[in-house]
Amino acid sequence: MILVLLTYKVELSEIDALRPAHVDWLKQGLADGRLLMAGRKVPVTGGLFMARGTLDEVKAWAAGDPFATAGAADYDFIEVAPSILAPGLESLGQ
């Protein structure tokens, strides 16, 4: 599993203009089984998502995010090997 932290590099007005396409991209990731969860940082300085796949696979997938293609965010990728999981989240350890 890969945790991806996004930090916005542009004004929120630019992020807001890109957000509908970004959300569509995230929804496609859910449908494809790649995306596990996504959300905004509080305060709104970026966001994060968790994705299935190898580091290289997730980096390649994230390159298609409209925030990435517009150069609107920096991405930090953290590979995670879950070992303790709440009930119902066991599949994240696979």
PLM region spans:
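Conserved, structured core segments of small domains
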Residues: 1-94
